[in-house]
Amino acid sequence: EDQSNFKENLKIINNQIKQIENLVNEFSDFARMPKPILKNNDLIKILDENIKLLSEVDKSITIDLIKTNNQIIFNCDKEQIARVFFNLIKNSIESIQQKVEKNVSFKKKISIEILSNDHHIKLILVDNGIGFNQNNNIKEILSPYFTTKKQGTGLGLSIVNKIINDHNGELEFYPENDGAKIEINFKLNGNWNFNSWW
């Protein structure tokens, strides 16, 4: 019994060490986030690469990409935008996995839609995971150290938001009846004009 207690305590300590490592790494990332190096990149290609990579994490989750164009060129820092897509899709996967832990039987899916016109690029990500608490507002969700995950540091979304802001964009969260919806709007030129969507 003493040995099993020792093993359990060791496991807890190891998990705590990992959490501290994650926190230190993410905090240094947040503090040292370089200015974006802007080049013309294809957002569809960056999205496709991240979807392929993250589809391997949990093959029981369907990830659909809905696109109106085969190519959307955006003047951006490829590494930073890839990190945004990676973090948001990974969050959706983890949210669905948390729902599965509650023994809920459902069709696990993530839908990503990307639209563009002369003024904006809009990305809409919808998942049917545990979702956001209706009581949490956008400032809470994006504040450093806010997290709903057992092992989370709460810095991931702050980093994502900073990258999006640095690319002249905005991040919005919408609680859904069954999951969550996230929207990213990148402004391409001039002032925000949401009426310009078709």
Regions picked out by a protein language model, each given a short descriptive name:
Residues 93-118:
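ATP-lid-like helix-loop hinge signature
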Residues 164-165:
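Detector for a conserved hydrophobic position within an alpha-helical segment of the HATPase_c
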Residues 5-33, 38-41, 45-57:
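Conserved DHp (HisKA) dimerization/phosphotransfer helix of two-component histidine kinases, i.e.
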Residues 62-72:
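Conserved catalytic submotifs in the C-terminal HATPase_c
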